[in-house]
Structures are given as C-alpha cells and as structure tokens.
Amino acid sequence: MTKKRKRQDDFQKVKLKVGKKKPKLENATATNFKTKAIHLPEQLKEDRTLPTNNRKLNIKDLLSQMHHYSGGVKQSALLGLKDLLSQYPFIIDAHLSNILSEVTAVFTDRDANVRLAAVQLLQFLAPKIRTEHISPFFPLVSAHLSSAMTHITEGIQEDSLKVLDILLEHYPALITGRSSILLKNFVELISHQQLSKGLVNRDRSQSWILSVNPNRRVTSQQWRLKVLARLSKFLQALADGSSRLRESEGLQEQKETPHATSNSIFINWKDHANDQQQIQVYENGGSQPNVSSQFRLRCLGTLGTVDEDLSSPENLKGFIEIIIPLLIECWIEALPPQLAASVGSGVEREPLQVMQQVLNVISLLWKLSKQQDETHTLESWLRKNYLTDFKHHFMSHFPYALKEITKQRKKDTNKSIKHCTVLSNNVDHLLLNLTLSDIMVSLANASTLQNDSSWIETIRKFVTETLKGGTRLNSKQLNRLLGVSWRLIQMQPNRDATENLIKAVYTLYQQRGLLLPVRTLLIKFFSKIYQKEELRSYRLRYRSKVLSRWLAGLPLQLSYLGSRNPELSTQLIDIIHTAASQANKDLLKNLQAAALRIYDPQEGAVVVLPAESQQRLVQLLYFLPTLPADLLSQLSRCCIMGRLGSSLAVTLIGILYMRSSFSGWSHSVNDCLMTDVDYLSFLFSTLTGFSKEELTWLQNLRGVPHVVQTSLSPVLLYLTDLDQFLHHWDITEAVCHSLLVIPARSQSFDIMQSAISKHLVGLTVIPDSTAGCIFGVMCKLLDHTCVVNEALLPFLASCCYSLLYFLLTLEKGDAEHLKKRDKLWEVCVSILALLPRVLRLMLQSLRVNRASPEELPVVGQLLRLLLQHVPLRSHMLTNAILVQQIIKNITTLKSGSVQEQWLTDLHYCFSVYISGHPQGPSILNALY
Amino acid sequence: MAAPMEVVVCTDAAAQLWSCVVWELHSGANLLTYRGGQAGPRGLALLNGEYLLAAQQGKNYICAWELQRKDQLQQKIMCPGPVTCLTTAPNGLYVLAGIAESIYLWEVCTGNLLVILSRHYQDVSCLKFTGDGSHFVSAGKDCLALAWSLCSVLQADPSRILAPRHVWSQHTLPITDLHCGFGGPMARVATASLDQTVKLWAISSGDLLLSVLFDMGITSVTMDLAEHHIFCGGSDGSIFQVDLCSWPGLREHSFQPEQNTGKVFKGHRNQVTCLSVSTDGSVLLSGSHDESVRLWDVKSKQCLRTVTLKGPVTNAAIILAPPSMLNPEFRPSLPLPHFNKHLLGAEHGDEAQGGGLRLQLGLHLQGKEPSYLERLEQLQAVLSSYLEKNMLGSQMLPARVFDLEDEVRSLRKINRDLFDFSTRIITRPSK
C-alpha cells in the first residue's frame, strides 16, 4: 500500500482546472533572462605606423571605404575621417590630395546623408587649410562643385550651394578665379535655355527663361531666392577681389589704402646715422631680390579660362545681357503688376527678400562695371539698354515698404522664414530702397539730368526724408545712403538742391550718440565734399553754408571730446589740419577760439590724447593765426609738466621759434602773431620748469628729505625726480638753442638776467633742475658783449655752492640722483670758470667757522676738487689768499682732533697747485 | 677749351655793399658783384646764361642784370605782388615766379604772362624745374608739393582748371625747400619740411620713395648729381647726410668707432637756409641764418672755408660759370623784353597784336624744302626706276612668276587630296 501510494506520489496527475493558472513545470526552461550582443566596434589590432581614429581605422582604410557602394559605409567613413583629422591635424597636410579628391567626389553622391557628411567635413577642413595650400587642388574642387551645381538631381543642386557657401567664405580669391564656369551654372540653376527653333536666331538675351520645377521641396521662388543670394555673395567676392587690385573709388570703397606704402621707405635719421638702417632706394642696385613679388610662372587658378571671366568689359556685358532679363522676371514674379497697384500698403516678406536680392545682384554688377569702365562706354551702354526697363518695373512704385504680416498667416510665414533664415534673417526695406536708388542714380549723370529729372527728384526726396527722419541707421544703410547722396551732389549743378542734401546729412550728424562707424562715415562724407569744393579754382569756389558750419564746429567738438574717443579725435584732427594748412578762414577763427581749451595743460586734448595725435596737435600750432600770451603760458605749462614727452616738447619749442619774429627774414615780421615779449616770457617760464604757484609752495618746505640744506648758503635745494629732471634738461637744450639764435645776444642775455633777478632771486628753496638749467643757459649765452648784472652774482654764488654741496654729499646708494651728478657738475664748473666773480663770491661766503663740523669735510673736498679742475686753476690762483684763509680756518677748527685724510689731501693739493706755482708763493709772500 | 669754372653765387638779406656776389669755388677769389636791392630767399635765378634775375625781398619786382655788365641794373620786372620764389627753365624759355599763393609763368622771348596757376592754398615757398624743363615742382606753406607738366600747363584751355600731375600731401608742416634730381621726367624730387622729415618722390610715378625723420625741422635740402647722398640742413645749423645707396658688402669691413658722427656737418650756429653740391660731388656749400657761407669737404665732413656776410644768407649756389659771365665783350643774344603784368588774353588791346603772332617752327625752311607731294613723286620715280631696272636686268622674272604659280597650283591639289582622303577616313565608321 505504502509502495503503491508512494508510486502514486511519484506520478501524481496534476489536475488542471478551468480558470486556474497552469502550474509551472519543474523542468521548464527559464526564458526570463535577457541577452545582449557583444558589439566590437574597434579592431583590437593596433597599427603603430599610422594614427587611427576611435574605431582604429587609419586614413587608408577610411579613404578606401569611400569607394564602397553602400551609402552608410561612405557616411561613416566621412564621419570617421572628420574624427581622425580633428585628432591628428598633421594628417591633413600629408594626405591633402587624397582627402580632397575623395571628399569632393561625393558632392554628387545620390545619398543625401553622404552629401551632408561631406559638406560637414568640408566645413571642418576649410579653416584648417590655407589658401596657398589648397590652390593646386582647386581646379579639382571647383570641377566637382560645378558638376554638382549642374546635376540633374535637385537635391544635389541644393547641396552644392552649401559647398559654394563654404568655399566663398574661406577661399574667395580662388573661387572668383573660376567665375566663368560658375556664373553660367548660376544662370542654369534658375533658368533654362530656350532651344525651340524660332528663338535660335534671336539674340541670346531672350533665349533664357526662368524655369519652374515642381519636384523641388521648396517653392520656386524660395529656390530662386537661395540662388540669387549665393550669386550676390559670389559677385561681392568678385568685386572685393578686383577692387583690391584697382584703385577704389567712391565713398563705399573708401578703404584705407595708404598711398604707396608697399615701396616707400620710412626711416629714422638716428638709426640711419648709427648704421642700423640702410637705405636702398634704387631697385636695380639692390643686392637682395624683391621677395614680395606676386608674379608666378604658372597660373594656378585659371587654366585657359582667363578670357571668359568678368574681367573684361565685353564678357561682363554678355553676362549682364543674360542675367538682367532673368532678374527682371524674378522681380515681376515677386511683385506682379496687377498686385503692384496695392503696393502702397507694403510688400510681404518673401517677395521683398527676392526683390532685395535682385537689386543686390544688379548693384554688384554695376559696381563691377564701374571698376572696369575707364571710358564710361559701359555706363552709357547700360543706360541705353536698361533705363526704360528699370524705370518701368522698379521706379513706378518706388518707396517700398514692408507689409505687417497678419495674425492668421503667422504659421505659414514662420515656415517660410525657417527656409529663408539662412539667407537673410531680417528684411530691410530701407536698404532695399537705398540699393534701388543707388542703382538708378548711377545710371544718371550731369548731362542727362534733364531727361531724368522726374525720378531723380523722387529719389532725392526719399533720401532727404530718410536723412532727416532721424531713424537709427546702421553703417551699411548709411553707407548706401551717403553713396547715393554723394552721387546726387556730384551730378547736380543746382546749388539749392545740393545745399538741402548737405543740410539733411548735417541734421543726421548733429544727433547725439551715433556709433563710431556711422560718425566716421559722416565725417568722411563731409571731408570729401570739402575737398571737392577746395579743388575748384577761386572764381568757381562756392562755400556751402552748412559745410562751413560743420567745419567751423570741428575745433570745439575736438575740445569737448577729450580723451573719450581717441579714434574720432584723430579723424577730427586730420580734417582740421588739412583745412588749417589750406588757410580756411572760418576754421582758423574757430580754432583760435577753441585753442585755449585744446591746449589746456590739465585736461586739454593735447595732453590726454595718444602721442600720435599730440604730435598733430602740436604741429597744428604752426597754423594758428595768433598766439596770445595766455595760450603761450598754457603751452609752457604743457611743456613743463612732462605729459607731452620731451621730444614733442622740443618740437613745440621749435615750432614756436619758427613762428616768432626771430626766425624769419627781417622784413617778414608778423607782428600780430606773437609779440617778442610773450615769446621770451614763454621761453623763460619753460626754462624755469616750475610755475609761480609751485615755487611759492616750495618756499615753505623745510626738513623734508627732498630739501637739501646747508649752513653756508642761504639757498636750499629741492630735489626733483629723475624723470622730471631729465625732461627739464632736454627742454632746456631746446630753449637754449632758441635763445642762442636770437641775433642780439647781449639783449637777450639782459632780458634773461632781469627775469631771473625778478622771479628767482629772493627765493630760498630752488629746485635743483632749475638751478642747473639756469646755469646752463647762462654759460651758453654769455659772450664778451654781455654785461652781468651785479645783483645777480650773490644769488648765483649761493646756488652754485648749494648745488656743489648737494653733489658732494650724494651717497653712492642714491642711484636716482647719481645720474644728475655729471650734468650738474659740468654746469657748475663752467659757470665758475666763465664768471670768476661768482667763484670769488662763493669762496667769500665760505665762512667755515659758522659751518657745522659735519660740513667741514665737504668744504675741504670741494676746495680740493676745484683746485684739481684745470679750467678753474687760474681763477683759483687769483683767489689764492682767500683759499689759503679758508684752509687755515679749517685747520684751526680741526686742530683739536686727529688730522684726517681729507685735510691732508687738501693741504697737499694746495701746496702742489698754488704754492708750487711759480707766481703763487711770491704773491703770497708779498702779501704776508 | 678748359672745363667751365665752378663759381659760387651768394646773396644775403642785408645787401650793404652789393646784392649778389660771385666767387670762385676753390680759391675763394671774388670775381663779380652785382649791386641794387636785396634778393629774397630762393629768389635768385640765372636766365639762359645771359641774365641774372633776383626777386626782391618783400617788394613786388624782380631785378635783372646782364651777367657781364655787373654794375648796371638792366631792368626791373614789375610783378603783381611780392615774389616769394623764382626760377627759370634750363633752356631759358620760361620764367616762373611764386607770388603769394599763385605761380606765374612768363615766356621770356615775348614777355607774355602765359598762365597763373593757383592750386596752392598758402604762399609758395619754392619752385624748381626738372633738368630738361619738361616738368616743374612747386611747394608751399600749405604743406603741399605739386608736380606740374609744363606741356599740359601751357596747352590747357583757360576754361578748364589746371591740374598738376601729382599732388604730394604727406608733409604735415610747411615745406621749406625742394631739390629736383637729375633725369628730366624720370627725376626724383627731395622735399624738406618743418615737420622734421625729408621725403623723396618720383616724378614719373608720383610715388613716395623715402621718408627720413629727423630730430628737428629741416630747412634746406639738396642731392649730389649722382644722387648717392641727400644733404639736409637742420634748423639748429647741423647738416645731415643721408646715404641713398647702402653697400651691404662693406658692412663687415667698416669698423669705425665714430660712425654716427660721420654723417653730420657741424659748424653753423643757426638754421641752414641753402645747400648746394658741386658737380663732382666733393664739395658742399651751405648758407645759414648765422650770416656765413661755409664750404665743406663731403668725404671728411670738414669745413674748408667760411665766408662771413653782412646778413642772413638768402641764396648760395654752386653753378657752372656761363661763358658770358667772365667775358666782358659778351652781348646777350636777345634783349630782355618787357614782362607783362597781366595774363595774355585778358589784356584789352591784346587781340590786335596777339592775333598775328602764331609762330610755326621751321617756317623759314619752307621755301627750300619740297612739299610732300613733290617728295612722293620723287619717291615713286625712284621706285619705278628700280623696278624697271630689275625687270630689264633679269628677264627671268616672268618665268619665275610662272613657276611659282605652278607650285601654288600643285600645292592646292595636294591639299584637296589630303582633305578628301581624311574625310573618307573619318566618315567610314559612320557608314
């Protein structure tokens, strides 16, 4: 039983009931685990020879994958290539030829993803490859590009534009070299040639018509917009490239082209004199080849297509003939004549964009034609062929406005905007109108003014209103606007109209807070008008009132501008300088009025601006009609204060000398310019180096480390900073020269003397630089005709002693003042040699019994040095008794203590130079 | 005949004893003096080797002396205003004078005032002709230097504004002196200015070749004939030498401790007003406001001689003495005409005399020379006679012509055959 039961246990039948879950079998396979495939994206092998990317594929593998039939492989190869090249940029140089040939080949790939990857790779590569590196491969690149542009598949055509964008951005010079093919491609992108037989015989301009392709993803208008945007970019690059070669003309292209800087040499005389700079003016004598030559034996960019691009007027004419009818068609499509009636309320965004691109292309074509057109034949041809068309289509509804988009259509427009954001994200109806005016105005000239007066008048009104409207214009709009105005002014003989235009520009100029580029443009515009006016001869010269008001306001503006905007100040100074050198009366009058502000030593433009502008301002002084005393005193402050730089200060003194009555020929005295008194007082105050206030302030200084005091001299020395000292010294040189060249030497010496005795004698604290400079000037000016004022001598003697005392007590460690030593010693000794009476007075003042014991060694050393100095020896000899007396006094004072070294030296020197002299002892003996 | 003597012509502003003195360059011997008036700066000119012209300082006339009759003032040319500078064309046909801001151009043979150029905005300070007289350069206190072509100035119609060939506006302060180099229209012009620079320009291209910046305003400039050096006189009396040709090969050999002093002539105490170099380039003459004229050896930079005058030196120049200067028997080939004060054509009675004065060069030869028609006939005769002679000389000619025609025919045939053959070849595969 048990056995049976047991067996029953073993093979118990499981009863399955409806509604209950089936119990799991014990031997059922568990299927609840999850599996994952092991994915090995990278090879384990490590190639040591070539760098690899993340997937361990080297450049050869990747390039060979490019030939794979599958789009996915190609795409991944392109991505891998990008990865590899970003990690190892040096591969680019090594394999450029292979990379480019493979990458450009897939511009025409059927798979959109592959093309996208190729474009991305190109985008990545382009900034890394320089123009001269890619130029040998550029024929290949452009061949692939043009095959993509002319491809039958629309997608490839669209993507080719992206490639073109990249190339235009990075290699404008190279791509414009292939213009003959590319321009044709552009035309073919938006149109097709009529091949029907009836049209064959007609001229080619009619044989192209706009094409509509229903298969495109975008509307044909958007497509055209895209193509036209690229075309205008391309033409822009072309125009830029050619304007670099030719001399630019007009306000738009006023890039700073420094006149012939390439071959003119600028050198500094000092460098040349030191043989640091050699001059080689004549090219044939040069031993070095001229390396900056642009000449190439082989023409790399354009192989045999030179005769077809737009560089010749004939080809340009041909292209214009093809493209302009197409553009007009585009315009009509964007703005159908039946809708045009309602144009007053505005044009919608998208047509406006098309219109703008159309006008852009035309204006660029005009610009190109102007660059090539020397004889104005092209201009008249353009006028003949297109004026009527343009007038009819463009001008009939001239000022175009943007229509505000209504709410219901917002969704729609958003979508279209998304397409167009690449091209131009904001539509600028003002720019559109201005471009149109530019195009139209360039078709007219002075001789045809009669016929065109109606539409010219419209444009003029529009321009004037825009200028006066006070709207915020950006520099691009303003550039166009001023270009149109300039052209209008040029061809308009009528003065009132011109005056109105200038006035309108002036109202714009008067606005506050204009941006610098805008302000610069306006200034350039005015200066151009001014120069044009000045070119006319006197009879025909007509002074525009607004213009002269503008010009007259410049000095005041400059003075108010201060240091806020140095660039603007530079421009203003340039114009003022030009006008002043041309002796423009209004300007000079205003400059005179503003001079006190400009040349203010505290915050005038002359001290706050950078050095370049300072120099121009200093030069401007030459042209001032009069130099009154107050201006001169300011200028002398400017010179002294050291904010002008010593070389510039010297220049200033030189210029003033040139304007003074002493430089000219005797007859040409301009007495109204600057009186001699003012000039001399300028020189003297510059010589002093300190203003009266500063000097009086100095008088109260005592016991400061900067003041040197001795017990033997009433004059205290104020020690100046080394910088100030050297600056003062440099200026003194210039002042000295100015004084020296005054013909009546004795008179100028007298004036200098009386000035010193009036302003400096009686002061107790004197700056060391002032004392030194006065000595220097007196030494240089003194000659046999001059009579020295008696009252001056004691002052000079005490100054001299103070200086010498200062020099002898200088400590070795004081590096700053040590540099002064040689200069000061030289002037002191020379003044003592030139004026023996000063020496005598100084020796007399050495009452050693009043001196402090510390000062005695200094006096001893001084006497020894004076004795040793050869030029002074004879004078010392005449004062031998005095010297002997002083030495005797010192010896008695020192007798108590031990004989020191300096005293021994002094005794020795005295005995050698004076007692040893043949006459010396006899005189002494006679006296004793 | 010996080489012409080099002499120095000087004037000073005082003019106490004489207004102009001529002395021999090397010996310093006084040769001639001219009396009357004070010559102004840059106002001395030699006309055609026969007359000496001196613009008077601050006065509105020009003195003219015959070169050999030194003591006698020949003529006073009245001008509309004080003359600031004066020059004459090298061929002696024109006189240029700067009067205020205008340039006056006279024709010497008639004395007519041909043109008044007013492109300067302030006083003209110096005027120079190029060596061949085809161009002249003017510079003024308005910082501008203008290069004019004489032809275009003379031919322009009065209605149009006369434009200079080049406008050089890089100077920023008044130009004080200019020197025109050798080479006619290819010459280089050096200008000196108070803005402390000396600039060198090319007349042919109008380019700025060189600009040298100094420490002081430059008041005079000159070049030697070979244009190896520019000499620049500074406002403090130093004269600087700028070498235009560097010799890179020499740089290793030249070790001179005092190199930087080797390019300055020091001696004058006031601004140098005029400079001149002798034709061999070895001697430099300088005149200064310190009332002295100095002669320097260019190579060693030493002062050879100092001549002290009575006033600031206004003009000093080394010239080759024209034969008339030293020959008392010499008479000028042309009497100096009366110089007109008014522009030709603007005068009232001008049409009456001016109408018939159209000169045609070579007119006096017309009688002797055959006309062009006659010449043509002559030429034809010569040609035909030559042809006839050839024909007669060789009877072969017709035969030769025949031969050649035959050859042409055969060549044509071959060409046609070739064409047929090739078309056959080409068209076969399409068959």
UniProtKB/Swiss-Prot annotation, chain A:
A GO term from the CC aspect: nucleolus
Domain of life, source organism: Eukaryota
Membrane spanning stretches: none
Start-end of each HEAT repeat: 99-137
Subcellular location: Nucleus, Nucleolus; Nucleus, Nucleoplasm; Cytoplasm
Residues found modified as Phosphothreonine: T29
A UniProt-annotated Pfam family: Ipi1_N
Annotated S-S bridges: none
Alphabetical keyword list: Cytoplasm, Nucleus, Phosphoprotein
Chain segments annotated as coiled-coil in the UniProt record: none
Function description: Functions as a component of the Five Friends of Methylated CHTOP (5FMC) complex; the 5FMC complex is recruited to ZNF148 by methylated CHTOP, leading to desumoylation of ZNF148 and subsequent transactivation of ZNF148 target genes. Component of the PELP1 complex involved in the nucleolar steps of 28S rRNA maturation and the subsequent nucleoplasmic transit of the pre-60S ribosomal subunit.
Oligomer status and interactors: Component of some MLL1/MLL complex, at least composed of the core components KMT2A/MLL1, ASH2L, HCFC1/HCF1, WDR5 and RBBP5, as well as the facultative components BACC1, CHD8, E2F6, HSP70, INO80C, KANSL1, LAS1L, MAX, MCRS1, MGA, KAT8/MOF, PELP1, PHF20, PRP31, RING2, RUVB1/TIP49A, RUVB2/TIP49B, SENP3, TAF1, TAF4, TAF6, TAF7, TAF9 and TEX10. Component of the 5FMC complex, at least composed of PELP1, LAS1L, TEX10, WDR18 and SENP3; the complex interacts with methylated CHTOP and ZNF148. Component of the PELP1 complex, composed of at least PELP1, TEX10 and WDR18.
Family: Belongs to the IPI1/TEX10 family.
The protein, known as: Testis-expressed protein 10
Provenance organism: Mus musculus (Mouse)
Gene: Tex10
Curated annotation (Swiss-Prot), chain B:
SUPFAM superfamilies per record: WD40 repeat-like (SSF50978)
One Pfam family it belongs to: WD40_alt
PROSITE patterns attached to this UniProt entry: WD_REPEATS_1, WD_REPEATS_2, WD_REPEATS_REGION
A single Gene Ontology CC term: nucleolus
Compartments where located: Nucleus, Nucleolus; Nucleus, Nucleoplasm; Cytoplasm; Dynein axonemal particle
Signal peptide: none
Assigned keywords, A-Z: Cytoplasm, Developmental protein, Nucleus, Repeat, WD repeat
WD repeat positions: 36-75, 78-116, 119-158, 170-211, 213-257, 267-306
Role: Functions as a component of the Five Friends of Methylated CHTOP (5FMC) complex; the 5FMC complex is recruited to ZNF148 by methylated CHTOP, leading to desumoylation of ZNF148 and subsequent transactivation of ZNF148 target genes. Component of the PELP1 complex involved in the nucleolar steps of 28S rRNA maturation and the subsequent nucleoplasmic transit of the pre-60S ribosomal subunit. May play a role during development.
PANTHER family noted in UniProt: WD REPEAT-CONTAINING PROTEIN 18, WD-REPEAT PROTEIN 18
Protein name: WD repeat-containing protein 18
Gene source species: Mus musculus (Mouse)
